[in-house]
Amino acid sequence: MLTKAPRGTKDVLPSESYKWQYVENLMREICEFYGYKEIRTPGFEHTELFLRGVGESTDIVRKEMYTFNDRSGRSITLKAEGTSPAVRAFIEHGLYAETQPTKLYYITPVYRYEKPQAGRLREHHQFGVEIFGAKSASADAEVISIAMTLLKKLGLNNLELRINSVGCPVCRKNYNKVLKEFLKEHLDELCDDCKVRYEVNPLRVLDCKVESCRRVTGEAPLITDYLCDDCRNHFEELKKYLDAMGYDYIVDPRIVRGLDYYTKTAFEIISKDIGAQGTVCGGGRYDGLIEECGGPSMPGVGFGMGIERLLLTLEQNGIEIPKPEGPDLFIAYIGDEAKLFTFTLANKLRFNGLKVEIDHMERSLKAQMKYANKLNAKFAVVIGEEELESKKVKLKNMATGEETEILIDEIEKAIKN
């Protein structure tokens, strides 16, 4: 057991980590273009935050959270999603008192006790974007645009954007009555989880993926027919912005998301190539969450995107992430005196901005050059007694085999030029 990672977790080795770095760097770059700033929140929070923020009727709270009492008897939960901690930080540090909106993003591990499967682990990593303080549908459109821009820049084109409005507490109350009356006639066709949802939060039945439940909800009344004027106008405004940006979308009444805090906009971006776990991004508006968590009455909207699932989607689409380049220079050496000189020279060149590799395995000169090839080094030099005396080396271009004699002090300039 000591040599095996816990079930539902995965090591990211150097052969894969470059893909993560590429994707995460692109996420940060795009967010900066849109004016979003990074936030980092703790890996665990007080359990009450998720009970109030995510909702006690959700699968996350009922089945999936990692919750324990610490040594002081406080109930603590490992971060189960990214929005509630961001809201907590927004309130705790008084960011609501600053000029609005507040635009944040995060890349963070989250923990859920789920059945491990492709693209879904018990520890997975989430990219999220939140914008607090903006009630306009243009904010909803902006976060959708960030997600679509990222996916398209990664080369994903076989996507569906599905949108819905889940209304506000006022119009949703009316719809819940109608929906509950409809579901009452089909209770025996619902799965066990949805029978519980029927009692606690019937809207969540629409989100169920069980086929028997989907057959029932396919005939259910549409929430969009029960929206109040404010929610309907907001949804129409969102569609105008999406149309203006040229995004195709499908209005899907089943999109309600798995969290209780959503109001008005709910959306998902689905890859047609990843199978059962096709949603690569999901989000929406949560105009009551900040107040529910103890802050002022302020709106918010955002999304979450699983990085593991995104990488799986890229793989299934045959999209290859560029591998990092090899070192700028490999310095081979002959003898102990040359090794010491090589070691200090490599450090100096690294400090000045070059990627430099040397041998630590006491290989022969021939083996060192073979190792340089394996590392895909751009240039190589050999330093021995003769080179130490003359202060000159032959700089070898590893791609062409061409050699140029230069002073050791000119190595940096020669490579950079």
Swiss-Prot record:
<dbReference type="GO" id="GO:0005737">
    <property type="term" value="C:cytoplasm"/>
</dbReference>
<keyword id="KW-0030">Aminoacyl-tRNA synthetase</keyword>
<dbReference type="GO" id="GO:0004821">
    <property type="term" value="F:histidine-tRNA ligase activity"/>
</dbReference>
<protein>
    <recommendedName>
        <fullName>Histidine--tRNA ligase</fullName>
        <ecNumber>6.1.1.21</ecNumber>
    </recommendedName>
</protein>
<dbReference type="InterPro" id="IPR033656">
    <property type="entry name" value="HisRS_anticodon"/>
</dbReference>
<dbReference type="Pfam" id="PF03129">
    <property type="entry name" value="HGTP_anticodon"/>
</dbReference>
<dbReference type="InterPro" id="IPR036621">
    <property type="entry name" value="Anticodon-bd_dom_sf"/>
</dbReference>
<dbReference type="InterPro" id="IPR045864">
    <property type="entry name" value="aa-tRNA-synth_II/BPL/LPL"/>
</dbReference>
<comment type="similarity">
    <text>Belongs to the class-II aminoacyl-tRNA synthetase family.</text>
</comment>
<keyword id="KW-0648">Protein biosynthesis</keyword>
<dbReference type="GO" id="GO:0140096">
    <property type="term" value="F:catalytic activity, acting on a protein"/>
</dbReference>
<dbReference type="InterPro" id="IPR006195">
    <property type="entry name" value="aa-tRNA-synth_II"/>
</dbReference>
<dbReference type="InterPro" id="IPR015807">
    <property type="entry name" value="His-tRNA-ligase"/>
</dbReference>
<dbReference type="InterPro" id="IPR041715">
    <property type="entry name" value="HisRS-like_core"/>
</dbReference>
<keyword id="KW-0963">Cytoplasm</keyword>
<comment type="subunit">
    <text>Homodimer.</text>
</comment>
<dbReference type="GO" id="GO:0005524">
    <property type="term" value="F:ATP binding"/>
</dbReference>
<keyword id="KW-0436">Ligase</keyword>
<dbReference type="Pfam" id="PF13393">
    <property type="entry name" value="tRNA-synt_His"/>
</dbReference>
<dbReference type="InterPro" id="IPR004516">
    <property type="entry name" value="HisRS/HisZ"/>
</dbReference>
<dbReference type="GO" id="GO:0016740">
    <property type="term" value="F:transferase activity"/>
</dbReference>
<dbReference type="GO" id="GO:0006427">
    <property type="term" value="P:histidyl-tRNA aminoacylation"/>
</dbReference>
<keyword id="KW-0067">ATP-binding</keyword>
<keyword id="KW-0547">Nucleotide-binding</keyword>
<dbReference type="InterPro" id="IPR004154">
    <property type="entry name" value="Anticodon-bd"/>
</dbReference>
